């Protein structure tokens, strides 16, 4: 189930870069913010407010019975019938969401070696979790194995709603941030993100259309990003050592 990545529109990439500036600026100021991947759900977003206009106009889930919805089910059933042991094992390894799913591409000891960058990723992850949960509740799309319990057999059980995938959107955001700091690793980072997203479909816990909202990383441009000294300091350090 290999699919090519969608190229980043240049204008959106510029907007995303400006938001990264504010990410690092605030992250360096506050190192105690909890991460949803380690300390439970956040009570509020970190950089965003959650009230940005884009969330109110975000495209909704595919309608039940629509062409996309029917195609989703057919893809899910086809993959379920053909998934091999390697694919199943990969899906099980990627089952639990963590920033490490992406940072391991750079270094398995990333948090220790690059603590300032890890702060940025952790705080961005708070926003990703908060906004993704909000959109999931609005759309209330049932998981494939919940919507079609007699047809879809998941590799493991998952709670909450299906659209959009938190694994796909969260790791996409992490990869886009890291690609700015480690440009030579961009292809490897994006391949890893696609692998994680595909594993969610292999596991039967997401439809394909749930895992392709590469929109999330671009929306951080909504946040003001005038204070950028800290990010500039971090982004210039890969030539020597990011710490």
Locate predicted features.
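Bacterial N-terminal signal peptides that target proteins for export
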Residues: 1-9
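Bacterial N-terminal signal peptides
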Residues: 9-18
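Boundary at the C-terminal end of the N-terminal hydrophobic targeting segment
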Residues: 22-24
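Hydrophobic alpha-helical bundle signature of multipass membrane enzymes
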Residues: 26-203, 224-227
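Alpha-helical transmembrane segments that form the membrane-embedded catalytic/substrate-binding core
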Residues: 167-171, 206-241
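Short, conserved aromatic-histidine micro-motifs
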Residues: 191-194, 198, 234-243
């Amino acid at each position: 189930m290999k699919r090519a990545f969608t190229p980043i529109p240049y204008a959106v990439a510029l907007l995303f870069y400006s938001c990264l500036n504010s990410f690092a600026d605030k992250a360096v100021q506050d190192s105690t913010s909890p991460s949803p991947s380690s300390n439970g759900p956040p009570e509020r977003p970190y950089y965003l407010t959650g009230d940005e206009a884009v969330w109110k106009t975000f495209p909704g889930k595919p309608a039940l019975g629509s062409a996309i919805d029917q195609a989703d089910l057919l893809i899910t059933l086809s993959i379920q019938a053909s998934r091999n042991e390697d694919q199943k094992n990969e899906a099980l390894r990627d089952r639990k969401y963590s920033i490490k799913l992406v940072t391991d591409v750079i270094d398995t000891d990333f948090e220790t070696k690059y603590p300032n960058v890890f702060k940025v990723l952790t705080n961005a992850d708070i926003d990703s979790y908060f906004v993704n949960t909000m959109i999931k509740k609005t759309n209330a799309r049932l998981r494939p194995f919940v919507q079609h319990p007699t047809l879809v057999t998941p590799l493991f059980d998952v709670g909450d709603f299906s659209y959009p995938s938190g694994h796909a959107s969260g790791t996409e955001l992490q990869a886009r941030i890291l690609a700015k700091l480690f440009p030579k690793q961009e292809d490897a980072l994006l391949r890893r993100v696609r692998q994680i997203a595909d594993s969610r479909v292999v596991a039967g816990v997401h439809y394909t259309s749930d895992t392709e909202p590469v929109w999330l990383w671009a929306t951080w441009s909504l946040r003001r990003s005038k204070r950028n000294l800290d990010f500039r300091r971090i982004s210039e350090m890969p030539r020597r050592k990011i710490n």
